[in-house]
Amino acid sequence: GEAMSIGRTFEESLLKALRSTEYDPAAYWAEVGDDELETRYLSRPTPDRTYAVFEAFERGYDVETVAELTGIKEWYLERYKRVTDSMAAAAAGEFTAAATAGVTNAEIATAADAAVDDVETAVPGRTYKQVDTCAGEFAAQTPYYYSSRKPEFYPGPLTDDAAAGELRVDRDVESVVVVGGGPIRIGQGVEFDYCSVHA
């Protein structure tokens, strides 16, 4: 299958895409030894390989070894490792890195053996950013938005980035938000949004 996602970081986008596939890896990693992990899951391009990469980092593999086994460029693998490292930090009670990486509050709570409510109060909520579909050439008539963690998580040029187009709602004007009933699939688009609001 395929998935498309948008986030402020590669990690966030990757995790959103993985969740949207609604795919559970076939392997029960506790039953898979290192040899099988390397020969069956890392060395072969299967739907489970992405999850096997996370498993390898959880087991302590380094980026260079995983790159050699998979043929995946180290830049990408470093981002996978950031997710794994952030989950280890979450298990120790530090939730910010995992939240920044795009891990859900429920997943963080599971890793930390904490209540979801405790995680939600410890990490800032989400904001909605506009995708500039016209690359600044002119105002977009059909703006798209994506959710992300609030900007205080992102140091540097992303903080207070007015060009990123944060969604603001004028409370004096009536408005409506259309929320889909399930994951959006590649091939669905504006025409389905149009049908939703005109149904």
Regions found by a protein language model. Name each.
Residues 1-199:
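ATP-dependent carboxylate/acyl-activation modules
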